[in-house]
């Protein structure tokens, strides 16, 4: 697909130039202009550690062939972030057939919610893995999002009873970038990585589980989200993006399926396409992301920055408020298998913004979808936008289970001050019916109502109803 055209008056000159080009000279020039190595992602100390691990690859392979133990592949143990990155580098740089006959699993763990036994961490005996389809849309279970580049299971450590998400990646598709960002950068709105374990020819990544599922699952099961729900989600996503962007990290795949609900927050997941820039502009060697949420500058492959994530968030906001991704209603997938050219020529998709969108939210979406990335606001700027900070009286009382219980407690306290000492005395309380009602208000009944609201809460963003 062409995005540039050459004038016809220059065509003859170009044809003549091509005829006299020496292909080998062109290749030499391009190799000098574009180094084959990926730009450095982390601080020199971490990169030096990873490079040292790479230098030992040949020795490790010879040890594997001879049947001797390799330090990185001998057991499952607790370690540091540096240990995990070295482990990831080692297994990604070693041919997968070296792992097929491994007698036992190996890996590096960062959190003690995972409990290996004598250097082992075995399925069924140490950890249970439940296919995500068995829990999907099951009211009594956790929702677990499906990863773009691997299957995701619900996992539970048998000893600690900790529930986790477990992403399975074939070793030949595994890349160090699958763990680097989550391992090196911790934030409340980024799903925490607990560790990586290699079983046979499959890498298992254990991380924080989304109790409420993904935004995409919420949309598929409940339809378009209400604006106060969108505000709640957007603020959490922007906090995560603000942190990542301050570290010059581009997520590259912001979309509903990569935003996951916890009981009191939303977190970002799936950092397999993420990179940390070493300059102000990142020049990719390939397209990164999901095309329907891609910004025009990403599609052009001429360099982009963290502002690409802001555009993707704007496209995600349209999906949340309408229940449908941008472009799809006007350009059905059956007729348009690819949206790259449409986005390049027609972005931004302002016509897809919901008709009932408030003026403030419309302004925020339009700013996020600004075609020129230099005019696009930063995550920190959007967090201050009035659309995300409505007056207190307009904010729904639905922040968390704790706030729901606190609200009920305050209500009961006020009621208790108004009650006579003996609420059973009909002369004081009026009717027996009123007395029974007051007794119920002072009982656990109200708290159970709040808990019922909590079960609604963990299946998606907070709702207005609490019982």
Curated annotation (Swiss-Prot):
Broad EC category: transferase
A GO molecular function term, named singly, is: MAP kinase kinase kinase activity
Report the PTM annotation: Autophosphorylated. Isoform 1 undergoes phosphorylation mainly on Ser residues, and isoform 2 on both Ser and Thr residues. Phosphorylated on Thr-290; the phosphorylation is necessary but not sufficient for full kinase activity in vitro and for the dissociation of isoform 1 from NFKB1, leading to its degradation. Phosphorylated on Ser-400 by IKBKB; the phosphorylation is required for LPS-stimulated activation of the MAPK/ERK pathway in macrophages.
Expression induction per the record is: Up-regulated by IL12 in T-lymphocytes. Up-regulated in subcutaneous adipose tissue of obese individuals.
Modified residue annotations for Phosphothreonine: 80, 290
Record's PROSITE patterns?
Answer: PROTEIN_KINASE_DOM, PROTEIN_KINASE_ST
As cofactor, the record names: Mg(2+)
Q: Which GO terms describe its cellular component?
A: cytoplasm; cytosol
Question: Which keywords, in A-to-Z order, does the entry hold?
Answer: ATP-binding, Cell cycle, Cytoplasm, Immunity, Kinase, Magnesium, Metal-binding, Nucleotide-binding, Phosphoprotein, Proto-oncogene, Serine/threonine-protein kinase, Transferase
The lineage's top-level taxon is: Eukaryota
Its Gene Ontology biological processes?
MAPK cascade; positive regulation of inflammatory response; protein phosphorylation; T cell costimulation
Give the principal location in a single coarse category: cytoplasm
Q: Which residues form the Protein kinase domain?
A: 138-388
Q: What is the effect of changing residue 290 to A?
A: Loss of MEK phosphorylation activity and almost abolished autophosphorylation activity. Loss of IL1-stimulated MEK phosphorylation activity but not of IL1-stimulated autophosphorylation activity. No effect on KSR2 binding
Chain positions recorded as ATP binding sites: 144-152, 167
Free-text tissue specificity from the UniProt record:
Expressed in several normal tissues and human tumor-derived cell lines.
Instruction: Indicate where this protein resides in the cell.
Output: Cytoplasm
Catalytic reactions on record = L-seryl-[protein] + ATP = O-phospho-L-seryl-[protein] + ADP + H(+); L-threonyl-[protein] + ATP = O-phospho-L-threonyl-[protein] + ADP + H(+)
* PTM annotation (Phosphoserine): residues: 141, 400, 443
| Enzyme Commission code(s) on record | 2.7.11.25
Which Cys pairs does UniProt list as disulfide-bonded?
none
Q: What does this protein do?
A: Required for lipopolysaccharide (LPS)-induced, TLR4-mediated activation of the MAPK/ERK pathway in macrophages, thus being critical for production of the pro-inflammatory cytokine TNF-alpha (TNF) during immune responses. Involved in the regulation of T-helper cell differentiation and IFNG expression in T-cells. Involved in mediating host resistance to bacterial infection through negative regulation of type I interferon (IFN) production. In vitro, activates MAPK/ERK pathway in response to IL1 in an IRAK1-independent manner, leading to up-regulation of IL8 and CCL4.
Assembly and partners are described as: Forms a ternary complex with NFKB1/p105 and TNIP2. Interacts with NFKB1; the interaction increases the stability of MAP3K8 but inhibits its MEK phosphorylation activity, whereas loss of interaction following LPS stimulation leads to its degradation. Interacts with CD40 and TRAF6; the interaction is required for ERK activation. Interacts with KSR2; the interaction inhibits ERK and NF-kappa-B activation.
Q: What is this protein called?
A: Mitogen-activated protein kinase kinase kinase 8
Source organism per UniProt:
Homo sapiens
Provide the organism lineage as a comma list: Eukaryota, Metazoa, Chordata, Craniata, Vertebrata
């Amino acid at each position: 697909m062409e995005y540039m055209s050459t004038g016809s008056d220059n065509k003859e000159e170009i044809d003549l130039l091509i005829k006299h080009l020496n292909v080998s000279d062109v290749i030499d020039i391009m190799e000098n202009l574009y180094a084959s190595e990926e730009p450095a992602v982390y601080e020199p100390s971490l990169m030096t550690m990873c490079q040292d691990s790479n230098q030992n690859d040949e020795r490790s392979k010879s040890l594997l062939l001879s049947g001797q133990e390799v330090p990185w592949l001998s057991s499952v143990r607790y370690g540091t972030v540096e240990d995990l990155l070295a482990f990831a580098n080692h297994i990604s740089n070693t041919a997968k057939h070296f792992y097929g006959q491994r007698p036992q699993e190996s890996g590096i763990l960062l959190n003690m919610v995972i409990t290996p036994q004598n250097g082992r961490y075995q399925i069924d005996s140490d950890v249970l893995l439940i296919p995500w389809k068995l829990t999907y849309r099951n009211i009594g279970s956790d929702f677990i999002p499906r990863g773009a580049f691997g299957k995701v299971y619900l996992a539970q450590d048998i000893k600690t009873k900790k529930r986790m998400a477990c992403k399975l990646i074939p070793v030949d598709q595994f890349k160090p970038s699958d763990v680097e960002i989550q391992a090196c950068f911790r934030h409340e709105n980024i799903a925490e990585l607990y560790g990586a374990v290699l079983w046979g020819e499959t890498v298992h990544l254990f991380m924080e589980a989304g109790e409420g599922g993904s935004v995409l699952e919420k949309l598929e099961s409940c339809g378009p989200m209400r604006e106060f729900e969108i505000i709640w989600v957007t603020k959490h996503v922007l906090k995560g993006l603000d942190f990542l962007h301050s570290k010059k990290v581009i997520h590259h795949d912001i979309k509903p399926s990569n935003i996951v609900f916890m009981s009191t927050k939303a977190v970002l997941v799936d950092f397999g396409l993420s990179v940390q820039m070493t300059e102000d502009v990142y020049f990719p060697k390939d397209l990164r992301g999901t095309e329907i949420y891609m910004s025009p500058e990403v599609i052009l492959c001429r360099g982009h920055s963290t502002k690409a994530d802001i555009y993707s968030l704007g496209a995600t906001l349209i999906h949340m408020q309408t229940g449908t991704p941008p472009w799809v209603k006007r350009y059905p997938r059956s007729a348009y298998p690819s949206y790259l050219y449409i986005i390049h020529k027609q972005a931004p998709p302002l016509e897809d913004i919901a008709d009932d969108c408030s003026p403030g939210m419309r302004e925020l979406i339009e700013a996020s979808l600004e075609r020129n990335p230099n005019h696009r606001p930063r995550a920190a700027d959007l967090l201050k936008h009035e659309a995300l900070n409505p007056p207190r009286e307009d904010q729904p009382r639905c922040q968390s289970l704790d706030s729901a219980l606190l609200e009920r407690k305050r209500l009961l306290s006020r009621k208790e001050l108004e009650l006579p000492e003996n609420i059973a005395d009909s002369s004081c309380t009026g009717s027996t019916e009123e007395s029974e009602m007051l007794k119920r208000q002072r009982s656990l009944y109200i708290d159970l109502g709040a808990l019922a609201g909590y079960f609604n809460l963990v299946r998606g963003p907070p709702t207005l109803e609490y019982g």
